[in-house]
């Protein structure tokens, strides 16, 4: 841990006493945040995204949720994010073989109060919030061409170790 500060930023930790799933954990962490918009980052991916530009887009669109997306070719281990010409997300598709598409890169910018209406303590951020609300809440994509790697499997973890030595 970085204690309570890192490079001038105040750090506040949110520790789960019991399993809350992704949505419950995010909701609990949001309750400790003070800013109106909060970045959420998956712990098992690395995605080089311009966070300042993502924040500007989030504000400009009036999004409740902005999702960093990455265009990929020939994949099956990720679901896809479909969005219209304005960047408004219109659908999240489950994992299936895909020739070309945008994936959820695991970086989000979310309004702090976005999950307040969810009464469940344990829920999935992706399924019970994102997929359930995509038709009624303004979610926007933030496409990025930055380096992306998911280290959730041993082969990609090893690849990340090699890649970071040369970066």
Task: Locate the predicted segments by residue.
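Residues within well-formed alpha-helices
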Residues: 21-24, 28, 57, 67, ...
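Residue-level detector of anion-binding/catalytic polar loops
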Residues: 12, 64, 138
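Conserved N-terminal catalytic core of the sugar/cofactor nucleotidyltransferase
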Residues: 1-42, 51-53, 83, 117
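A short, conserved acidic/glycine-rich loop-to-beta-strand motif
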Residues: 61-71
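Catalytic-core segments of class I nucleotidyltransferases/pyrophosphorylases
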Residues: 37-39, 46, 52-59, 72-75, ...
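Short loop/edge segments at beta-strand edges and connector loops
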Residues: 15, 42, 67-69, 143
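Short, well-ordered turn and helix-capping elements at secondary-structure junctions
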Residues: 2, 15-17, 69-70, 93-96
């Amino acid at each position: 841990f970085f204690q309570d500060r890192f490079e001038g930023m105040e750090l506040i930790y949110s520790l789960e006493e019991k399993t809350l799933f992704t949505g419950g954990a995010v909701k609990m962490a949001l309750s400790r945040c003070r800013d109106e918009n909060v970045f959420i980052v998956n712990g098992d991916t690395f995605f080089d995204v311009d966070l300042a530009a993502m924040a500007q887009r989030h504000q400009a669109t009036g999004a409740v949720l902005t999702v960093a997306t990455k265009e990929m070719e020939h994949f099956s281990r990720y679901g896809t994010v479909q969005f219209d010409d304005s960047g408004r997300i219109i659908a999240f598709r489950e994992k299936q073989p895909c020739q070309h598409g945008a994936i959820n890169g695991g970086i989000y910018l979310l309004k702090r109060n976005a999950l307040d209406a969810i009464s469940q303590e344990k829920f999935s951020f992706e399924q019970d919030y994102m997929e359930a609300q995509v038709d009624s809440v303004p979610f926007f994509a933030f496409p990025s061409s930055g380096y992306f790697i998911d280290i959730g499997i041993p082969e990609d973890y090893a690849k990340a170790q090699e890649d970071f030595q040369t970066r």
